[in-house]
């Protein structure tokens, strides 16, 4: 049995991050019928479905329906998001019975050169992940930009520290260097993700 399987429910995204190579494919969103057909074929192959490859999953107009399908079929569902749409989708995620984990790529703010208010962005993320984590959903705040300029990291860490009333970077680390901000809510640090080069020779 595979540890996890990724399904791209949409290749549309509302950002253009420098760490993502994007796609030349036409914009496409998987229908609930297509999704259920695929999910049925994956039963017994894995317990965990990650609804993300390229694209922003929170852009899917029928995301609650997809999450209901995964729950009905017995999967544990994980989402990876840039976080910009969390204020809009928070209630839908809170009511989704099959959501197991939500990962938020905080480094997308810097990676996409967003010109908006970072504090407002972080507030929108925090106001979503806090009640989700309190409900028992695992929430990971990702800073996967080790080895890059990290221009926004100090402001992000300062914001998180203010929310928990202690220095987030002084919290104990696990074996992977991650820190627990509160129950079910984690800060993940890692090197910048490198997308596989499909044209590179096999090694």
Predicted regions and their residues:
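Conserved alpha-helical substructure of the radical SAM core
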Residues: 1-102, 113-117
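Radical SAM enzyme [4Fe-4S]-AdoMet core and its adjacent flexible, acidic
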Residues: 30, 73-76, 96-203
């Amino acid at each position: 049995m595979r540890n996890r399987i990724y399904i791209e429910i949409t290749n549309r995204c509302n950002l253009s991050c420098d760490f993502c190579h994007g796609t030349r494919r036409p914009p496409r969103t998987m229908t609930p019928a297509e999704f259920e057909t695929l999910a049925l074929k994956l039963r017994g192959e894995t317990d965990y479905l990650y609804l993300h490859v390229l694209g922003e999953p929170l852009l899917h107009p029928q995301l609650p329906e997809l999450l209901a399908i995964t729950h009905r079929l017995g999967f544990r569902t994980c989402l990876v998001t840039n976080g910009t749409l969390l204020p809009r989708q928070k209630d839908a995620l809170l009511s989704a019975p099959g959501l197991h984990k939500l990962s938020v790529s905080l480094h997308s703010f810097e990676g996409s050169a967003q010109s908006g208010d970072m504090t407002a962005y972080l507030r929108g993320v925090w106001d979503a992940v806090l009640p989700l984590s309190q409900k028992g959903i695992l929430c990971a705040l990702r800073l996967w930009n080790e080895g890059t300029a990290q221009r926004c990291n100090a402001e992000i860490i300062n914001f998180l520290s203010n929310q928990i009333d202690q220095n987030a970077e002084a919290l104990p680390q696990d074996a992977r260097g991650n820190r627990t901000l509160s129950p079910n809510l984690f800060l993940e640090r890692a090197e910048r993700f490198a997308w596989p080069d499909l044209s590179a020779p096999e090694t």
